[in-house]
């Protein structure tokens, strides 16, 4: 998925590198580059891809919440981008540069609650209803009673939230809807394996460079350019750590669990706390959100999603990494012409990160086809065959 959502499709990706903990060679060996193949894993700032950043204040019953958005463009419809679980708005960085060069549009990439730099009173409430309301509230806070035309584009969990937002009519100026690699049937089938996937990820990283390297070599993000900006939004410094210490060799793909001996419980707990502190010192970065704790919301994100998507009375686009992801309802709907679909092969679950140019072409073609936006830079539409 992203972490969480990536696991939904893990077994269906044909050319996936082995994940840490899955028995692949990466899980037991240190990550090393061959001679002459060293790559740059240093993080890249958001400002290389977005024009500006804004913290949008939203008033509610409990006070004020602040939602981080990244923006580009000044004309055309607003493409409101919703990331997948565990990711952040920065996962759209490379896509943003690609789409802005093809059509006249405005980009608003949003950090959903509990993710990225968004700060809310109750960051643990990740229900579909709450997050959909957040999206509507952010649009209202940014544009008032007369918002510009908006197209919702969401990846995985973000795609589900986009559909819930559209179905509840929370964005009155909505003109289009796009889901990226999220299908109810596949998602529901994968619910039982999500916790196992999350347990297989590293818990900490010694540096941002280490986190970026892991994301690429594990197959979470196959595009190094995107990983260098995207992973910054997925990890944070551990609490109580002010600066990274040491410069030890790259951490292995998995932080192996400590073996428990037969000491008394007090001794074990004391040793565990000491070990945790040492781990934080050597590996001061961890995930921004503990996805395992959001399990009670997973079913609500995806159950009934296909029919909800089909029921939205606006032009719709579905982008998939593989045609085998279609469930029965979407297969019938696609045959009936209820939405446009395009398959982008040779991508992982993070389609918009792995192939940002192809996703930008698909979205730009969709916008021009429906006369929602004007092409720029001599962009030529290429209509898909399905």
Curated annotation (Swiss-Prot):
In this UniProt entry, the residues modified to Phosphoserine are 15
* Modified how: Phosphorylated by SIK1 following increases in intracellular sodium, leading to dissociation from the protein phosphatase 2A (PP2A) complex and subsequent dephosphorylation of sodium/potassium-transporting ATPase ATP1A1.
Any single GO molecular-function term of the entry would be: protein phosphatase inhibitor activity
Q: Where is the composition biased (Basic and acidic residues)?
A: 268-280
Q: Please give the residue ranges the record annotates as the region Disordered.
A: 1-38, 255-280
- Asymmetric dimethylarginine-modified residues are where? 16
What SUPFAM superfamilies has UniProt attached to this entry? alpha/beta-Hydrolases
Q: Which InterPro entries match?
A: AB_hydrolase_1, AB_hydrolase_fold, Epox_hydrolase-like, PPase_methylesterase_euk
Q: In which tissues is it expressed?
A: Ubiquitous. Highly expressed in testis and brain.
> Where in the sequence is Omega-N-methylarginine found?
16
Where composition is biased (Acidic residues), the residues are 255-265
EC number assigned by the record: 3.1.1.89
Q: Which UniProt keywords apply?
A: Hydrolase, Methylation, Phosphoprotein, Serine esterase
Q: Any idea which residues are catalytic in this one?
A: 156, 181, 349
Q: Name one Pfam family in it.
A: Abhydrolase_6
The chemistry this enzyme catalyses reads: [phosphatase 2A protein]-C-terminal L-leucine methyl ester + H2O = [phosphatase 2A protein]-C-terminal L-leucine + methanol + H(+)
Q: Which family does it belong to?
A: Belongs to the AB hydrolase superfamily.
- Summary of subunit composition and partner proteins: Binds PPP2CA and PPP2CB.
Protein task: Demethylates proteins that have been reversibly carboxymethylated. Demethylates PPP2CB (in vitro) and PPP2CA. Binding to PPP2CA displaces the manganese ion and inactivates the enzyme.
- Entries under PANTHER family matching the protein: PROTEIN PHOSPHATASE METHYLESTERASE 1, PROTEIN PHOSPHATASE METHYLESTERASE-1 RELATED
Q: What is this protein called?
A: Protein phosphatase methylesterase 1
Q: Name the species this protein comes from.
A: Mus musculus
